[in-house]
């Protein structure tokens, strides 16, 4: 049995836009962290500094993947909104004959 759809295409698009904004915010945060690491490396030298920077570099791909996933959700919600809108119109056209 199908569930009840309680969302409009406009609401889905608005939510998609929010996911897109959050995706960009993650990338902005990565840029800020890159600058902070660079600044820190100019003040802190040695093995511990290198270990800290290496640890960040190992984590950075996860941040990028998070941004990519948020962008994927953005696109999926947009596609769902388009499908919902199109399907509703198709049903209306069938009813009209």
From Swiss-Prot:
It is found in: Secreted. Changing residue 44 to F/Y: Strong decrease in secretion. It comes from the Bacteria. The keyword Signal does not apply. Residues 21-94 form a coiled coil. The keyword Repressor does not apply. Changing residue 46 to A: Lack of secretion, but does not affect dimerization. Belongs to the WXG100 family. sagEsxA-like subfamily. Homodimer. The WXG motif and the C-terminal tail are crucial for secretion. Required to deliver LXG toxins to target cells. This is Protein YukE. It comes from Bacillus subtilis (strain 168).
């Amino acid at each position: 049995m199908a569930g009840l759809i309680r969302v409009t295409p406009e609401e889905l698009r608005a939510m998609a836009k929010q996911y897109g904004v959050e995706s960009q915010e993650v990338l902005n945060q990565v840029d800020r962290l890159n600058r902070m690491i660079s600044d820190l490396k100019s003040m802190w030298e040695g093995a511990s500094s290198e270990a800290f920077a290496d640890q960040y570099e190992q984590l950075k791909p996860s941040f990028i993947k998070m941004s990519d996933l948020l962008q994927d959700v953005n696109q999926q919600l947009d596609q769902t909104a388009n499908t919902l809108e199109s399907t509703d119109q198709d049903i209306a056209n069938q009813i009209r004959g």
